[in-house]
Amino acid sequence: MIERGVEKPALLKADLHIHTRYSMDCDTPLEKIISRCRELGINCIAVADHGTAEGALEMQRIAPFKVIVAEEILTTHGEIMGMFLKETIPSGITPREAVMRIRAQGGLVNIP
């Protein structure tokens, strides 16, 4: 039962692993991603480029929907994804160091 005056929470239709032209394996411009998300009704994305959070930070500035800043960090033992980041975490560090740096930013550790 919905109480009068209590707003119903909005539903999110999300894609939680998107790459942009900032990633080594993608050349899709940010504007094209925004356009496609609108077509599909997606209102939340996590931009997780390889080795950088810059694409996610830029997308967060221009997108008309929720953008989670993420990054795929190449560690000495494979990739770890950090979500809800504030800045880029460098590649080539140990998994332990990556986890510590993600948590230091208040982020969520995700093993893809």
Report the location of each language-model feature.
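A metal-dependent hydrolase metal-coordination microenvironment
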Residues: I2-Q105
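Active-site-proximal loop/helix segments of hydrolase catalytic cores
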Residues: Q105, I111-P112
